[in-house]
């Protein structure tokens, strides 16, 4: 009986540590200003770290522009622009899905702005800024 209690105690402590760790990781979030632009002008973007990876995620009220190739772009504090993934991805049976979250590659040292860019027309659709660059 004592052994079972010890096992349950160990599992409870481990579960608590995992919960606290994931909660602490989510506490370190950064929210941008609202998107401003001709086609992308709703919602915000949030930056957070998850499992050691830098993640950007648009808010629920963000509407992906109805353009041929809306794409995630990141601008760093030096003004360098990095093109990431497309917002629209092909789903099953010809349907389209939205990529509302993207991993930021480790070679990007900081994030000052997030842009929505039409890769087909090569035009900026909107952008959102952080109050200070995120490292």
Where are these regions (language model features)?
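Bacterial N-terminal signal peptides
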Residues: 10-19
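Transition segment at domain starts
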Residues: 23-52, 87-88, 135
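Short amphipathic, basic-aromatic surface patches that mediate peripheral association
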Residues: 56-62
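Beta-strand signatures of extracellular beta-sandwich domains
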Residues: 71-75
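Solvent-exposed strand-loop boundary residues in beta-sheet-rich modules
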Residues: 76-80, 120, 134
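An anionic, turn-rich surface loop/hairpin at beta-sheet edges
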Residues: 80-106
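Short, exposed beta-strand-loop hairpins at the edges of beta-sheets
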Residues: 103-129
